[in-house]
């Protein structure tokens, strides 16, 4: 991770990444792995990847506050590079869709550890990436971007970079993200009403809804929005029961729900 500790090297690599995104990469074609994919979700079969990744020896970012700041800075630079290309080519929405697919893929621990493992060769990683690209239908510049992360040994930061891209995308498009948590899946009409409500409260140009299922709420739903979900609207039965318990001075009683 020497490059993370060398600002000059970091700037050089990031500049190269921005320039390289505008061109298609030429790569060798190593013998592909026989991996199982689901065409609907574009995810790996975790067992096959665990077999491929015998050792989870990953390149971890430098610890402590300094390490966190350096990781954040690096992620921001790469995410901004991808956003710049998407903005110039008029593919922001499509690129954000690519990023959402990649977030789901790399949230699978075996997938992430496979790519972050420095013991596994770049050719092998590219071979597996080719399958991801084909199955997920990624745009050429998004596919090229992930190849750049592999070549520049920044693939271990892919989660941070993808999350940072979402933040950059939201700022560019004036989008407010609202996380709606409910006991059961809400109908699209209900989600549309919630989106309108959040838009009215925040004044955002666009509102994007993310849904989470949490049976512990008993009934109703909660809405989190704002900077890192700092704002909360709690319409759950669980919250109402807690308020009733507080009014009856039953704070020390645990409600079985």
Curated annotation (Swiss-Prot):
Family matches, as Gene3D superfamilies: N-terminal domain of the delta subunit of the F1F0-ATP synthase
Molecular function terms from GO: proton-transporting ATP synthase activity, rotational mechanism
PROSITE patterns: ATPASE_DELTA (PS00389)
Pfam families: OSCP
GO terms for cellular component: chloroplast thylakoid membrane; proton-transporting ATP synthase complex
Keywords recorded for this protein, A-Z: ATP synthesis, CF(1), Chloroplast, Hydrogen ion transport, Ion transport, Membrane, Plastid, Thylakoid, Transit peptide, Transport
Cell compartment(s), UniProt: Plastid, Chloroplast thylakoid membrane
GO biological process, any: proton motive force-driven ATP synthesis
Chief location bin: plastid
InterPro entries listed in its UniProt record: ATP_synth_OSCP/delta_N_sf (IPR026015), ATPase_OSCP/d_CS (IPR020781), ATPase_OSCP/dsu (IPR000711)
Transit peptide residue numbers: 1-70
Role played: This protein seems to be part of the stalk that links CF(0) to CF(1). It either transmits conformational changes from CF(0) into CF(1) or is implicated in proton conduction.
Quaternary context: F-type ATPases have 2 components, CF(1) - the catalytic core - and CF(0) - the membrane proton channel. CF(1) has five subunits: alpha(3), beta(3), gamma(1), delta(1), epsilon(1). CF(0) has three main subunits: a, b and c.
PANTHER family referenced in this protein's UniProt entry, alphabetically: ATP SYNTHASE DELTA CHAIN
HAMAP family recorded: ATP_synth_delta_bact
Family classification: Belongs to the ATPase delta chain family.
Name listed for the protein in its UniProt record: ATP synthase delta chain, chloroplastic
Organism expressing this protein natively: Spinacia oleracea
Lineage: Eukaryota, Viridiplantae, Streptophyta, Embryophyta, Tracheophyta
Gene: ATPD
